[in-house]
Amino acid sequence: MSGLSNLLVPAVLFFALGFLARVIRSDLRFPPEMAKALSIYLLVAIGIHGGYELAKADLLTALHALLWAVVLGLTLPVLGYFVLLATRRVDGFNAAAIAAHYGSVSAGTFLTAIAYLKSIGVEYESYPVIMLAVMESPAIVIGLLLAAWTRGRARAGGATAATGGGNLGHILREAFTNGSVVLLIGAMVIGTVATPASIDSIKPFVNDIFMGVLCLFLLEMGLEAARRIEDFRRVGLLLVAFGVLMPVVSGLIGVAIGHGMLGFSIGGTTLVAVLAASASYIAVPPAMRLAVPEANPSLYLTLSLGVTFPFNVVFGIPLYHWVATRVAGV
């Protein structure tokens, strides 16, 4: 598949439908609880599948993947922070909050990438699922540390700064007990320890309806992403450019790690690139809102959900797969 055919995947088309419905002011809406239920199902399904595959995988390779997931989660926010400061469009607090989103991961983008790979018949390793489960928290920690550093510099310079909400221990607990992280890790453990026969009995639930539920999830995400269009004027052109270019740079770093450091196949390398390129819009926003009250939520929400998520779904995933094919397919 190439060119326009890369976009002719039901999941991507449903995202476009949701986006269009919002633009033309349709009354199409999802009940909040239904949207949450779709997210829960997808996390459980991908966790069980990943755990089942992990049970057959090599432990050393899994630990290696875990290590590089932490490295990505720690380094990408720092890169994003200094790039944002260089734009001179945001202060240190907003730079820290935005950077935390870009060091974390988007389960929705990851699931869309899986749908894309399945649609073109590309196999992938189970290890990126482990990486997905652990990359949320390191980025949140780095975001908090960058904000604390900025706050300390402001106080040292005699400037007044708002007191960050919540202590570090509380925020770290929030990060590690976040519902999406607990669900994903818990489902992975279940998929790992359950007997193959018992996993087979729930395959209609975790496999057969997966793609259909993903289409509904992305329909709702299209509606939500289009809602952020109105905030673009507040974000500014340079920050919109950051929301497009940062994922591309991070995705290339992900390709280098997926193939060069982990030795993954084209599919696995693509998924590592997607993990590196995605920006969180579920776990990180509440953590930043609580811990970095100085930051403007409309900036990091508009960038992660209104710019980067649509870019990755429509253009980024095919791009990262193309690069992975050129690198890992040699």
Regions found by a protein language model. Give the residues of each.
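N-terminal signal-anchor module of multipass membrane proteins
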Residues: M1-A55, L319
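Alpha-helical transmembrane segments of multi-pass small-molecule/ion transporters
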Residues: M1-F19, L59-L66, V70-M221, G236, ...
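Membrane-interface junctions of multi-pass transporters
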Residues: R22-K36, Y52-D58, T195-F210, R227-D231
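Generic secondary-structure boundary/loop-capping signal
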Residues: R25-D27, A45, G51, A99, ...
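Membrane-interfacial loop-to-transmembrane alpha-helix junctions, especially the N-terminal start
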Residues: A35-L38, S180, L239
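Transmembrane helix-loop junctions and nearby membrane-interface residues
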Residues: G47-G50, L54-A57, R151, G222-A225
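Membrane-helix boundary/juxtamembrane motif in polytopic membrane proteins
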Residues: F232-A241
